Design a protein with these regions (language model features):
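N-terminal binding-site loop/beta-alpha segment at the start of enzyme catalytic domains
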Residues: 1-58, 77-80, 93, 132, ...
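N-terminal small/glycine-rich loop or linker at the start of catalytic domains
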Residues: 1, 53-70, 99, 104-113
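Short, well-ordered amphipathic alpha-helices
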Residues: 39-44, 83-87, 133, 155-163
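Conserved, mostly hydrophobic/aromatic
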Residues: 3, 10, 18, 40, ...
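Active-site mouth loops of central-metabolism enzymes
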Residues: 1, 65-80, 116-124
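Beta/alpha (TIM)-barrel catalytic core signal, keyed to glycine-rich beta->alpha loops juxtaposed to Asp/Glu
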Residues: 103-205
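Short acidic capping loops at alpha-helix termini that bridge into adjacent secondary structure
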Residues: 50-53, 93-97, 143-144, 168-171
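CE4/NodB-like, metal-dependent polysaccharide N-deacetylase domain
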Residues: 78-99
């Protein structure tokens, strides 16, 4: 009921862009995995206001073994399972913005410092990931795609490939940005301006 009240109030105040993730609620736990999407989906069913909301969610990369039975990655099989599961929990037939929650490759994110390169790490090539997202767009399951917790190199590479190969273009970057964490300004701010890819700042307070 509290969640429903929050969504009712948000929409009444003109807040119509809602972002969630298959991983949520936060802090992430196995027993609450997917619950935020379920609550939003139940609200959609009750209110019949899906068309009033711009809905964003995220597919999780590697790290948490309980996600989708383990072995989660950005390969076509796991990605297909993820998008279908999110659609079911959200009780909708499309997602407005579908984001990669964090990089699949070994790199720095979530505040990690001291980059250590590892050529032995295995990850799906960006072109293949974009190809999978293209299939979801073609099927009408998602409309736009975006990134989260990504680096300047990763963002630039995705944008380069989408232009070269005619694949879906990343439309947004959801990274932390606030008075105590201004790392976005180091490299990603320039990418945002020059390549016209917007920031969805999280933890702004």
């Amino acid at each position: 009921n509290e969640g429903f009240e929050q969504m009712d109030y948000a929409l009444d105040q003109g807040v119509n862009f809602w972002d969630t993730a298959e991983l949520y609620a936060v802090p992430p736990k196995e027993e609450t995995y997917g619950h935020t999407e379920i609550i939003i989906g139940n609200w959609f069913k009750k209110s019949n206001k899906r068309d009033k909301v711009i809905l964003a969610t995220k597919v999780a990369g590697p790290m948490r073994a309980y996600l989708r039975g383990g072995g989660n990655n950005y390969g076509i099989v796991k990605m297909t399972q993820a998008v279908n599961d999110s659609l079911k929990r959200l009780q909708t037939d499309y997602i407005d913005l579908y984001q990669l929650h964090w990089p699949e490759r070994n790199t720095n994110f979530f505040g990690k410092l001291g980059y250590e390169h590892d050529d032995s790490s295995e990850w799906n090539q960006f072109e293949d990931v974009l190809g999978s997202l293209q299939k979801f767009v073609d099927a009408g399951k998602i409309r736009e795609v975006g990134l989260s917790n990504e680096t300047p190199w990763g963002v630039s590479k995705y944008l380069e490939l989408s232009k070269e190969k005619g694949l879906p273009r990343m439309m947004s970057i959801q990274n932390p940005y606030n008075l105590l964490n201004r790392t976005y300004e180091v490299g990603l701010a320039e990418v945002s301006v020059r390549d016209k890819i917007g920031l969805l700042a999280y933890s702004p307070l």
